[in-house]
Amino acid sequence: MSRCKAVIIKMLTAFTAIVWLAGCSSISPYSTVTKLDLKLTASDQLNPDLNGRPSPIVVRLIELKHPVAFENADFFSLYEHAKESLSPDLVASEELELRPGETVDFKLSVESGSRYVGVLAAYRDLRETQWRYVVQVTPADLTVAELILDQTGVHNKNEKLAKADD
């Protein structure tokens, strides 16, 4: 009986060690996973309607190998036919709705091969807004980006602050 207990204890110890090591590797600063911490902040004046009232907006996060097709395509090609418009650069995409005054934090593990995340925002007035933005991610590292969506479009918070200082 004690021999059986010893085998069970050894197996449990080995299993615990494997689980513990797997957990440590997932939070390791030496991880090879490409990560993006993305904060999207919607202003209180987001996406005004015809009467100037703020409105929710649909936002798509699009993982890309290269940004050129995303940067050159028109809004409707990207919104309605992303797979065809961005092939072969499209890796993955995700969609969400952002309400005026809302802040959303994402902690994304970017797919292997993705080097950029395109942000596509479905503004009511496409001609007068910056409806796309590209975030370059560093392979096998953590990239942090904070974007603001307001009545004029999508902007990097740090770039907007730098322009205000000029």
Spans of features found by a protein language model:
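Bacterial N-terminal signal peptides that target proteins for export
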Residues: S2-T13
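C-terminal motif of bacterial Sec signal peptides marking the signal peptidase cleavage site
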Residues: W20-G23
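Bacterial signal peptide processing site
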Residues: S25-S28
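Short amphipathic, basic-aromatic surface patches that mediate peripheral association
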Residues: K39-L50
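Extracellular beta-sheet/turn segments enriched in Thr/Pro/Gly and aliphatic residues
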Residues: S43-Q45, Q136-D166
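Short coil-to-beta strand junction motifs in C2/discoidin
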Residues: N51-R60
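Tryptophan-paired
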Residues: A73-V110
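A short, solvent-exposed beta-strand micro-motif common in secreted/extracellular proteins
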Residues: S114-R124
